Amino acid sequence: MSISSGSFAQPAAVVSSPGVTVPEPVASTPTMAELLQQPVYKARWQKMVKGQKNLPAWARKGAGTSGPYENITWGAQQYKVGSLCKPHDCSNNFMWVAFSNDKKHVWGLRVTVADKPEALDNPSKFATYQWLGRPNENIQAMLTAQLEKDPNWR
C-alpha cells in the first residue's frame, strides 16, 4: 500500500528501527470552510443563503475561519456539524452549521455578540441570533446545543 504525494509514492508506514513501526498519518477531517467549498455542499449553501436578509459577506460566501466539522447523531439522524466565524472577529461573529447526511439540507445559527466590554464575561446576554435554512425545532435544538457546549458561552 502506498500513498501518493504529488508524483512520488510514499510508504504507508515508516520503520524507524528494527521491530518498531511508526503508523501512517491519519487524514484530518476537513474544516467546515473547506466542506463549504466542495461543489455539492457549496450549491446547498448558496441556495440556503440566497433569500436571507442582513447576512454579511463572509457568511453569505461560507468563507471564514473554522475548525474540522464533526459527524454527530441527533434524534436518530446523522449530520455534519461545525462552526464558521468572521476572520479576525470570531468571538463576536460566528455561526453553527449543520448538513443532513444525505447532503440535501443545510441549516445555520448565526450569532452576533455586541462589541461591549461586558460581553466578554457573559456573551449570551449580548447576543442576537439569526436562523438560516428554516430549521425545525429539532434542528434548532441541535444547533443551540452545539453553541452551549462551548465553555466560553455563558
UniProtKB/Swiss-Prot annotation:
Record's protein name: Uncharacterized protein YPO2857/y1376/YP_2723
Spell out the GO cellular component terms annotated for this protein, sorted alphabetically and separated by semicolons. periplasmic space
Q: Where in the cell is it found?
A: Periplasm
- InterPro entries in alphabetical order: Inhibitor_vert_lysozyme_sf (IPR036501), Inhibitor_vertebrate_lysozyme (IPR014453)
Q: Which organism is it from?
A: Yersinia pestis
Q: Does the keyword Transmembrane apply?
A: no
Q: What superkingdom does the record give? A: Bacteria
Q: Which Pfam families match?
A: Ivy (PF08816)
Main localization, broad class: periplasm
**Record keywords:** Periplasm, Signal
Q: Where is the signal peptide?
A: 1-21
Keyword Transmembrane assigned to the entry: answer is no
Q: Which family does it belong to?
A: Belongs to the ivy family.
